[in-house]
Design a protein with these regions (language model features):
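Flexible, low-complexity segments enriched in proline/glycine/serine and punctuated by aromatic residues
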Residues: 1-94
Length: 94
């Protein structure tokens, strides 16, 4: 597996994990972000950044961003995003 494939696989896995909660569970903590250390599927030591951001106005869809990079080379990292849409019938306030 190439370095890029390895970082992408780790980012996809983390993005899937980051999107396991629904909009209502994440909304009360948005905006939020964190960085932690971990390992890729191929065993590389990397940093994972996870962020939950409003995709527009507060209370709109939530954009989830995951970046995976080797500590010495942020610019060569992989960044993936996904949206968690707001349920139009969800009447909870943020």
């Amino acid at each position: 597996m190439t370095r890029g494939e390895d970082l992408t696989a780790a980012a996809r896995d983390e993005l899937d994990r980051a999107c396991t909660l629904d909009w209502g569970q994440i909304a009360r903590h948005t905006p939020w972000g964190d960085t932690f250390e971990g390992f890729t599927p191929d065993g590389r030591e990397v940093c994972f950044e996870r962020a939950y951001l409003w995709d527009g106005e507060p209370g709109s869809d939530i954009r989830v961003e995951v970046t995976v990079y080797e500590p010495q080379d942020y610019e060569a990292g992989v960044k993936l995003t996904r949206a968690i849409p707001r349920d139009p019938f969800d009447i909870r306030s943020v």
